[in-house]
Amino acid sequence: IMDRYQPDGIFSNRWAGHGICYCEHCRKNFREFSGFELPAKSDRFDRVYQKYTEWNTGRLRELWLLWDDVIRKKKATSRFIPNGFPDKVITGRLSDIVFTDHQARSGVTMPWDNGKVAKELRASIGMKPLGGIFSVGLEEQYRWKDSVQTEAEIRIWVAEGIANGMRPWFTKFSGVLYDRRWLEIVEKIYNIHYRNERYLRNIAPLARIGMVF
């Protein structure tokens, strides 16, 4: 991929897996690390699972650095971007740019939840670029990726992220557009962002004197 296309970065989705892996390699590596067998279930109060979390985070970090090193040897300005690294502090230390995959709300989630996620990441990554990935479709239990939400729903979700320091990054699945209503909505979002970007980036205070009362 790097030799042929020279991309600016490779974003790896769902790379951390789901739950505990019981393959022969994970069994062997975890046993050598901890002296334990892999835990039977995810229980954060279990001592063995706590060791598993420590080992798993360390292993993911090793893979992150390995793949990033290979990519940068092919193109120095390119990066490997892991989606959803479990430790936000490590993410802040190692990343030049961070993405949050919080595409839309579901159920009774409040609109300001997107801004809350941005604030949490700012606490660990500082002022590094933060891309807020958003989707145009429904994000309920049964996700239909060809669906399109209302303009008001999409815009308020993205606006909350932008207001708290995110840069908008939209995602759309499938190369065929069955419902084109989202195109104009996303165009509006980016036009508004472009017109106001200088205020969103240049946020260092100009004041030299502060008053405390």
Where are these regions (language model features)?
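An active-site-proximal structural segment forming one wall of the substrate-binding cleft
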Residues: 1-17, 70, 192
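Aromatic- and acidic-residue-enriched segments that line the glycan-binding/catalytic groove
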Residues: 7, 12-43, 95
